[in-house]
């Protein structure tokens, strides 16, 4: 069954709030058995923060052809950490080739969380909580106020042919952030934003990232980990056939300098191209962005990490950096056929190792310090 938001009173003028209409149409589709399509035709639809909650009786596909636009007025979204949220939905599909415009420039100056611990979080553009067996495809997210996409407590989700865009200096605009979720695929997509292209927090398991172009941004990151007690492990990440262009980091694992105990293991990074990337390969167990962290050794154990066929150019002299914990050294780190060059003023490309155990095979440029 097709549910056209225009027939329920949606106004595609870019100024009228359509959140009640969208809520009503989703509820109708959700309570209908079989396959149901929510159609959002061409046009620009202003939308206040909305939660679309299951479980649903049948399958729901949100087919977005037009543009959804967030509110500019922050007084109406203060302390609301989402814009569009899907919860407890199974077999959800988002498709259509449309666009989500978070209107980030109206709020980025208010993003003070990196400096102010009492800050009010800005809205994440698209949140998925407890969503299963779902696909997000052929969509564009631009200028999120905070992260573009957040995936929490989800299972068996596929993101493909997604375009994520924000300026490189936009604060905290992570592309896709994953936590407490398993069997998540991110395929055939382009992410160009102001923070991590993809980031994984505790409880991320069996994550597959393939054929993704990242840049600008901060790279693909695991962490920061160890920030709280009883964190779930990160287990099973595969990143293949990806390209990084001008990013602040490439493949990064980071843990807090003085952390609680947890583990990160079974990570594989293969067939990666670096184009003028700072820190192409980095493990940082002294992570402290505020420079005001408690001193001590990280208690996060990093092991079974494989890097294979990583090639291209580094914008930093140190192209491979393993700064592991003295208390919990990195174990079973494997480097296979690394070819990274540096053409800056600091001299020959180099690697740096601290508290790491592993093996290097095949070509190694820079020369391996393992």
Summary of predicted features, one role per range:
Residues 1-370:
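Extracellular/periplasmic carbohydrate-active domains that bind, remodel
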């Amino acid at each position: 069954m097709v549910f056209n938001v225009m027939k329920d009173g949606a106004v595609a003028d870019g100024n009228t709030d359509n959140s009640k209409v969208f809520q009503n149409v989703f509820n109708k589709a959700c309570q209908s058995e079989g396959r149901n399509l929510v159609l959002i035709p061409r046009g620009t639809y202003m939308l206040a923060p909305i939660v679309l909650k299951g479980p649903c009786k049948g399958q729901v596909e949100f087919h977005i052809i037009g543009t959804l636009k967030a509110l500019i007025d922050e007084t109406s979204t203060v302390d609301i950490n989402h814009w569009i949220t899907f919860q407890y939905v199974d077999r959800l599909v988002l498709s259509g080739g449309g666009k989500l415009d978070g209107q980030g420039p109206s709020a980025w100056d208010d993003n003070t969380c990196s400096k102010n611990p009492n800050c009010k979080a800005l809205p994440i553009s698209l949140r998925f909580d407890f969503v299963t067996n779902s696909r997000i495809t052929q969509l564009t997210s631009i200028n999120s106020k905070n992260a573009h996409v957040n995936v929490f407590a989800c299972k068996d989700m596929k993101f493909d042919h997604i375009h994520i865009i924000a300026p490189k200096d936009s604060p905290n605009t992570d592309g896709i952030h994953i936590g407490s979720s398993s069997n998540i695929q991110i395929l055939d997509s382009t992410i160009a934003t102001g923070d991590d292209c993809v980031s994984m927090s505790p409880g991320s398991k069996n994550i597959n990232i393939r054929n993704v172009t990242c840049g600008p941004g901060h790279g693909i990151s695991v962490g920061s980990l160890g920030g709280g007690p009883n964190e779930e492990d990160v287990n099973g990440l595969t990143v293949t056939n990806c390209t990084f262009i001008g990013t602040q980091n490439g493949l990064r694992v980071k843990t807090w300098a003085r952390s609680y105990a947890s583990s990160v293991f079974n990570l594989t990074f293969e067939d990666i191209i670096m184009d003028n990337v700072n820190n192409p390969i980095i493990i940082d167990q002294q992570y402290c962005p505020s420079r005001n962290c408690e001193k001590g050794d990280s208690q996060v154990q990093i092991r079974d990490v494989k890097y294979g066929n990583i090639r291209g150019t580094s914008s930093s002299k140190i192209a491979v950096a393993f700064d592991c914990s003295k208390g919990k050294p990195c174990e079973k780190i494997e480097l296979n056929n690394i070819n990274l060059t540096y053409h800056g003023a600091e001299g020959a490309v180099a690697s740096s190792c601290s508290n790491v155990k592993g093996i290097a095979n095949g070509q190694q440029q820079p020369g391996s310090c393992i």
